[in-house]
């Protein structure tokens, strides 16, 4: 195995870390109605917890309102309760088989909490990226120890690991800044 192969093994994992971060922050409120806001909501249905999107359709009515069309009428109250209990600061109201979810404007304090949460998710992702870099360097050092590569190749490999880390940390920082701007926008 050569340095390039080690890098090709690690880079997709770093991309997945960025994608996981994007998915994680998608459910953080920004004051606008988006269907991803309800991604983490689990409904007690048929004796088990199910994701909300498996119980009904989620749609955007307008900038400040989501609508959930529950497929099974008997699940309306459980779905409404799950949305209310999800600790998202939302107050759903049932209307037949539909549930309207009004998105209240965020207070300054709540916005700051969401920014802090975004930064926490970002820091967790940076730790994952650094761990992947460490694994890459470990693999490269093992190759050198096994005499599969020269010391120069090892040093080039370490530099490549650092370059990969910087590239993905920059992407992460840009995403954090963008989400922070989105949250603080009134």
Swiss-Prot record:
Keyword field contains RNA-binding: no
A GO CC term attached to the entry: cytoplasm
A Pfam short name: RRF
GO molecular function terms listed in the Swiss-Prot or TrEMBL record: ribosomal large subunit binding
Gene3D superfamilies reported in the protein's UniProt record: 3.30.1360.40, Ribosome-recycling factor
Protein localization: Cytoplasm
GO biological process, one term: translational termination
Major localization listed first in the record, in broad terms: cytoplasm
Alphabetized UniProt keyword annotations: Cytoplasm, Protein biosynthesis
Entries under InterPro entries matching the protein: Ribosome_recyc_fac, Ribosome_recyc_fac_dom, RRF_sf
Function as written in the Swiss-Prot or TrEMBL entry: Responsible for the release of ribosomes from messenger RNA at the termination of protein biosynthesis. May increase the efficiency of translation by recycling ribosomes from one round of translation to another.
Similarity section: Belongs to the RRF family.
The protein, known as: Ribosome-recycling factor
């Amino acid at each position: 195995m050569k340095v390039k192969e080690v890098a090709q093994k690690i880079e997709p994992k770093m991309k997945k870390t960025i994608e996981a971060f994007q998915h994680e922050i998608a459910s953080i409120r920004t004051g606008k109605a988006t269907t991803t806001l309800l991604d983490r909501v689990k409904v007690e249905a048929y004796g088990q917890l199910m994701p909300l999107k498996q119980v009904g359709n989620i749609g955007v009515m307008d900038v400040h309102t989501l609508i959930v069309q529950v497929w099974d009428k008997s699940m309306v109250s459980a779905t409404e309760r799950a949305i209310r209990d999800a600790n998202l600061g939302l107050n759903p109201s049932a209307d037949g088989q539909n549930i309207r979810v009004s998105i209240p404007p965020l207070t300054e304090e709540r916005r700051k909490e969401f920014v802090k949460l975004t930064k926490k998710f970002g820091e967790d992702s940076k730790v994952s990226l650094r761990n992947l870099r460490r694994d890459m360097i470990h693999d490269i050092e093992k190759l050198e120890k096994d005499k599969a590569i020269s010391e120069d190749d090892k040093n080039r490999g370490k530099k490549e690991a650092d370059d990969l880390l910087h590239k993905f940390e920059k992407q992460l920082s840009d995403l954090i800044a963008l989400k922070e701007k989105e949250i603080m926008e009134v």
